[in-house]
Amino acid sequence: MSDQLIDRTMAFAGILQAVAQVQHIARHGNSDRDSLAACLNTVLVTNPDTTSDVYADKVALNKGYQLIINQLGDAKDKDVEVTRYLVGILALERKLARGNAMSILSERINQIHRQLHHFEITDEQVIANFAGIYSDIISTLGPKIQISGNPEYLKQSQVQEKIRALLLSAMRSAVLWRQLGGKRRHLVFARKTIVDTAKKSLTL
């Protein structure tokens, strides 16, 4: 098992970790603070020495690994909603990679770094800034990702901002996955290898 495969699977788990949080918040209106923080922190690590540096909370990443096993493995009960979100994120990432928005994205992330001198990463104002980056830079690139869930929660501004912030986190992992050589065809032709890597990467 190559280091690049391990790293690429880690980044893919990062996408699904964030997507799982989006799904949970959309359905239940709340989020686990540690899981939310773990996702948001990945956005801030822009010059990592290793892929592992991006995902400091290895336990939180387990949800992503479990989803890889479920979505790409032999399980019959695959989550169609998770697949739809994943397809949407990967489509937007391709448009981001082709455009010139990266420098603007970098500056906006630097603003959040400065904000963290005064606030925690899960503070409402910080989450609103993450959400603003997604709205201003990412969601303008292509068709919006349609989120399913409880309408009562989805109309709440705080829920909307958390969802957008988490979609930004998913996008960060998608960018990293692509940088590590990730390609859509791997999800079809190398599924078993990816699933095996996810199983070995699970932190128990």
Swiss-Prot record:
Q: Where is the secretion signal located?
A: none
Matching InterPro entries: HflD, HflD-like_sf
Quote the Gene3D superfamilies the UniProt record gives: HflD-like (1.10.3890.10)
Q: For this UniProt entry, what is the primary localization, expressed as one broad class?
A: cytoplasm
* Membrane-related topology note: Peripheral membrane protein
Q: Which domain of life is it from?
A: Bacteria
GO CC annotation terms, alphabetical: cytoplasm; plasma membrane
A matching Pfam family: DUF489
Q: Which UniProt keywords apply?
A: Cell inner membrane, Cell membrane, Cytoplasm, Membrane
Places the protein is found: Cytoplasm; Cell inner membrane
**What's this protein's family per the entry?**
Belongs to the HflD family.
Q: Which NCBIfam families does this chain map to? A: PRK00218.1-2, PRK00218.1-4
**PANTHER family (UniProt xref):** HIGH FREQUENCY LYSOGENIZATION PROTEIN HFLD
The name this protein carries in UniProt is: High frequency lysogenization protein HflD homolog
Q: Which organism is it from?
A: Shewanella sediminis (strain HAW-EB3)
